[in-house]
Amino acid sequence: MHTLPDRFEFLSDAWIDEARRVLAKACEQRKAELAPFSLSERFADAPPHLKLPDDVGAWTARYDGEAMTVARGFDPSADVTVEGDYQAGLAGGQFIGMLAPGAMKAMRREVAAMHGRDAVKMKGRIENAAAGEILALLHDHLGRRTVENPDLAHRAARQGLTRHIREMEEQGYTVIERAISPEFADEVRAATLRALLPHQSFSMNWMLYHGREFEQLIQNPMLMTLIDASLGRGAVIASFSSIKKGPGTGVIPMHTDYAHVPEPFPEFSLTGVGVWALEDWTVASGPTWMIPGSHRERRNPRPGENTRGQGVPIEMPKGSVVYFHKAVWHWQGDRTEPGDRVTLHAHFNRGILRSLEPKKTDVQMLHRNSPRLGEMLGEDDWFDKMSAQGRDSGRFAYMNKLHAFTEAKKRELLAN
């Protein structure tokens, strides 16, 4: 697949070549500190367009005390072996910051939450401290450059989301249960309350800029698959907001989020939102209510229109996300139990639309995340990059090809 410069797909030839270059340089520079070490990885069920033998991506890195060799193939005798499913391996490969305390544990925890405990298995240990540091830095270096699997149908099937994409098309919303671990949900909830406290507010925008937890949450691979299916590749963050709701009557009436869109609304989705449950959602907790299929009305609800009886409460366990087409009729339910419901709302627009929040791209934020965050902040498209000579042709061609491939795979998914 076509990618931007310095980007590559997981386990592609370009990925292997970059691993070889980085490891050879690092081992030469730190030769005095190193002892021989080896790492071998094998991931099954890679996307067909990579054209890997039997759709298995495998590679081995071995340092013999003098030189580093990197080659395709799996070596079960390596000091550390990693095996699993390609999509799960990719999810782990896009975690960055592996030298931070607890980072490896957090990565494995979240991959297990998305793909199951046995999706990736690691055996062995690197004893040499310098070698371990080199491999952690390699992981980060590649993670900053590794793009998402562009094959939407393949990706959705391996994430267990094929049904959800069909459901989203039919009823306008879908729920992914436990898309993050309960532990991470607790971390995000605590970070949200810390951000809200100084402002003495029940809601706040610009949550992306209040901690690493929000950077990680908004690019959750499961949610990203629904975004790609609904809005196409290149979708941008419209707004990332938080709401804290205590006991009482729901104050947000039935509405769509297409306030300024002329009726009839387009048949395709212009915008979408993922709402994260940071505690269990039940009827008593005051969840969002939705009318299934109401997006097909292609209009706003009329004053006095008595359709609430068709509504469904969104009940889901902590760590789940409900994603919905913004033309769906929805409202805030009454909270009848004590305590606060804390939610995060990740709003997205098709790439051709503007964000609701001012663009504030932090270079350090881009450096500590996978390319997906840059795509969501508009860094990969050609808008705002016009010169006197015209548009950025490289980015224009990249996004055109990615859009076309994604749409073709979505049609394939819905046809089967």
Residue ranges and their predicted role:
Residues 1-158:
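Feature captures hydrophobic
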Residues 77, 85, 89-105, 220-224, ...:
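Short acidic (Asp/Glu) patches
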Residues 250-315, 353-363:
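Catalytic core of non-heme Fe(II) oxygenases with the double-stranded beta-helix
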Residues 147-264:
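Non-heme Fe(II)-dependent double-stranded beta-helix
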Residues 78-80, 111, 116-118, 122, ...:
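Generic beta-strand structural signal
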Residues 298-323, 327-328, 333-416:
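Conserved double-stranded beta-helix
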Residues 43-45, 124-126, 241, 256-258, ...:
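Short, structured patches in soluble enzyme cores that scaffold and shape functional sites
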